[in-house]
């Protein structure tokens, strides 16, 4: 069965749904459980016209994200092996994490709304990641 499960979260309230699903599967399989959050690369969003210290902004975001991942991990009764914080292209960061940490199941969420039909990051991941995926529907109200 699975040996290492990675749960991709966006740090919204729905992240706990995904984490609980991952913890339940990990417990049944006796697998390691890890979390990952991917931030966009801020330097790609700004042009040279804006004078801003991107490294200090990025450092602050990384620190806040790490704290949020730690807090999320405390909300379940299963140990979280790794709390990963990536930056850049969502699909590429997940591919690299899957390879580096020997992940054999990736859990992501998918919003079933109008915009997700056109711009789904999960669909791109499905086309690139070479391990099993569990895509959990997140129903928008």
Curated annotation (Swiss-Prot):
Sections of the chain in a coiled coil: none
The keyword Cytoplasm appears for this protein: yes
GO cellular component: cytoplasm
Keywords in alphabetical order: Cytoplasm
Keyword Cytoplasm attached: yes
InterPro entries given in the database record: Rossmann-like_a/b/a_fold, Universal_stress_UspA, UspA
Cellular compartment(s): Cytoplasm
Family stated for the protein in its record: Belongs to the universal stress protein A family.
Subunit structure: Homodimer.
Summary of the function given for this chain in its UniProt record: Required for resistance to DNA-damaging agents.
Protein's name according to its UniProt entry: Universal stress protein A homolog
Gene: uspA
């Amino acid at each position: 069965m699975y040996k290492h499960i990675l749960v991709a979260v966006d740090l919204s309230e729905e992240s706990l749904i995904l984490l609980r699903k991952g913890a339940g599967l990990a417990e049944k399989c006796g697998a390691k459980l890890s979390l990952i959050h991917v931030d966009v690369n801020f330097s790609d969003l700004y042009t040279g016209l804006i004078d801003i210290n991107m490294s200090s902004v990025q450092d602050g975001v990384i620190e806040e994200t790490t704290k949020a991942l730690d807090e999320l991990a405390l909300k379940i009764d299963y140990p979280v092996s790794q709390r990963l914080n990536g930056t850049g292209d969502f699909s590429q960061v997940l591919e690299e994490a899957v390879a580096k940490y020997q992940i054999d199941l990736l859990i992501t969420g998918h919003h079933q709304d109008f915009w997700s039909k056109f711009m789904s990051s999960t669909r791109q991941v499905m086309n690139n990641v070479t391990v099993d995926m569990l895509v959990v529907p997140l129903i928008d109200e």
